[in-house]
């Protein structure tokens, strides 16, 4: 039996639309991510467990884990009879890389079960392909950090899909999921087809400056440059209370904040534990909309997807 855990991730990080993402892990040790188990069997089967299993498609062939198994078998050119279990701990349409968690855990578990026939680059390419079936287009800003860990910059040149960017140990990521769903495809459809020149220039300056600040170890500058002129001005209308929440967390002391992925999760970066706790408390009382919502104080998950049992 192989059991693989794949962590949640926060894509875009305001400054890097479709090209930046960070894997996250709650500081209290909770597993914020999906788990997939693979066991040898006579025929294929898929069982869904976990807090959000009831939100998955009732038709097994529509389940992305089934599609991962099917695509992996196609890649190897043979049928692989296994019993798979998906422990769906991540809410769907949350902006925390929920589909990426399932895809990464499923493909990594299949690869481990079969003795690692695929290298990490090929595996990551498959992960992007499968996740793209749900989001509507191939982009690696969730699957890359989820699989490899840390903060990842998408390269997609010279057979390099992504590379790690150094993060800051003092940064605490407060993630608040309000409990409502935002479809990635819907959130992409709301964006303009073309952008003004000044917005393109500002976006390039912010992203280049952020990467420079990470490598030159300037956390204050990096946080200041986490601005979004590409998606947030258009997507915030999909997120009730988002603008007020951003203003409130800034007043409490967050050094940056924005939309995690395509939302509705809000991220707030803090550089002190007491500030992070105050921000988390405020968001828990004011940004959450129902019982399914949650707030976690996280750090970067530098390990990425990992085998829990083998």
From Swiss-Prot:
UniProt keyword terms in alphabetical order: Amino-acid biosynthesis, ATP-binding, Cytoplasm, Kinase, Nucleotide-binding, Threonine biosynthesis, Transferase
Coiled coil: none
Gene Ontology CC annotations of this record: cytoplasm
The EC number(s) this enzyme carries: 2.7.1.39
HAMAP family, per the entry: Homoser_kinase (MF_00384)
Presence of keyword Magnesium: no
GO molecular function, one term: homoserine kinase activity
Binding residues annotated for ATP, in chain numbering: 91-101
Protein name, UniProt field: Homoserine kinase
UniProt pathway: Amino-acid biosynthesis; L-threonine biosynthesis; L-threonine from L-aspartate: step 4/5
Subcellular localization(s) per the UniProt record: Cytoplasm
